[in-house]
Amino acid sequence: MPSLSQIRQANELLEDSHSEIVAAFVGGTSGVGEEAAKRLASCVRKPEIFIVGRNEESAARVLAELRNANPQGSYQFVKVDISLLRNVDRACEAIRHKTQTLDLLFISAGSALVAREDTEEGLEKNLVERYYARMRFTQSLLPLLQASNKSPRVVSVLLGGFEIELETDNLDLTKPRTAIYSTRHAATMTSLSMEHLATVYRSISFVHIYPGMVKTPLLDKGLGRFLARIAWILYWPFSITLEQSGQYNVYMATSAAYPPLSPENQQGAGASLAEGGEICIGSTGKVGAGSYILNYDGANRTNVKLMEGYRVRDYAQHIWTHTLSTFQTVTGSAEPA
C-alpha cells in the first residue's frame, strides 16, 4: 500500500485526469462525508458537488466552505431524511433533474446507533439508513453513473471487513437484534449487493470502506460525550484525523487501484496510481474485480472465507432479489421511477 504522503501526492495530481468531476455526497453535512467532499473540491479544478442530507444549517456551512476552498466549483444542497425510502426517491429525482451524469456517489449517512426504532414504512431505522436507503440511492443513480467516462464509482462508508453470517430468515430484521448487530448485518448485505452489482454494471466500481476510528460528531452522539472521550483516549494510538480520512477516501473514490470489472475506456480505470500502489484484490479474490472491501487506508480487508461461502451459495444475487422485493413492498416499485 502507498503511504499517506504518497496518497496526498496522488490526490494533488487528480486534476490531471479529473479536471472536472460530478459527485454526490450522501451524508456530506458532517464528519467523514463532509471532509471527503472538501478534499475532493480542493483537488479538482472544476468540481460539481451535491451535498445530500437533513440539516440545512450544516449544509449552508459546508457549501460556504466548499466555495471558499474552490470558487470555480458548483455546489448544491439536496435536503432529505434518508430513513424513509420515499424521501430517497425524491432526492434522487432532484439530482437527476440537475445533472445528466455522475462520476461519484459517496455515501456515509446514518444516525447515531440507538435502540431499535421502526420507521412509518415498517422497516428497522438503522437498517434503512445503513443499507436500504444506500442501495436505493445506488439503484436510482446508476443511469447517471453509467453516463460517466471518469471512473464512475459508488462508495459506501460503513463496516467493510466486519461481515457476518446472516440469519437467512431475518434479512429485514423483523426479529429484533442489537444496534451493533444491525450495523454488521447491513455491512454484510452491502458487500454482497455490491459484489452482485459489479458483475451487472461492469463499467462502475463498487467500494465498501471501513473508516477506522475517526473523531467525528457521530462518536459523541452515539456514545455520549463522556464515554466518547474515554473511547477516544483508549483508541487514540489507532485513530486517524478527519483530514487523513479525507485524503484516504478521495484516493479510494478516484484511484485506478480500484477499477471496475470492465472499464469502457482508458480513463474508466480511474486516476493514476499513487507511487507504491497497485491494482487491488476485489471481494471475489481476483485483482480488479470491480467490488472492493477496504480498510480506511485503502488496503483490502475482505473476509475471504466468509465471502467465498456466500459466493458458493449465490447469495449476492439472493440479497439483491430480497432488496428489490423490499423496495417493491415499501415504495410500490422495485425499480425507481
From Swiss-Prot:
Its EC number is 1.-.-.-. Disruption phenotype: Impairs the synthesis of anditomin but accumulates andilesin A. It is an enzyme of class 1 (oxidoreductase). It holds the Pfam family adh_short. Keywords: Oxidoreductase. Transmembrane segments: none annotated. Gene3D superfamilies: NAD(P)-binding Rossmann-like Domain. GO terms for molecular function: oxidoreductase activity. One of its GO terms (biological process) is terpenoid biosynthetic process. Pathway: Secondary metabolite biosynthesis; terpenoid biosynthesis. InterPro entries: NAD(P)-bd_dom_sf, SDR_fam, Sec_Metab_Biosynth_Oxidored. The keyword Mitochondrion does not apply. Oxidoreductase; part of the gene cluster that mediates the biosynthesis of anditomin, a fungal meroterpenoid. The first step of the pathway is the synthesis of 3,5-dimethylorsellinic acid (DMOA) by the polyketide synthase andM. DMOA is then converted to the phthalide compound 5,7-dihydroxy-4,6-dimethylphthalide (DHDMP) by the cytochrome P450 monooxygenase andK, which is further prenylated by the prenyltransferase andD to yield farnesyl-DHDMP. Further epoxidation by the FAD-dependent monooxygenase andE leads to epoxyfarnesyl-DHDMP. Belongs to the NmrA-type oxidoreductase family. This is Oxidoreductase andH.
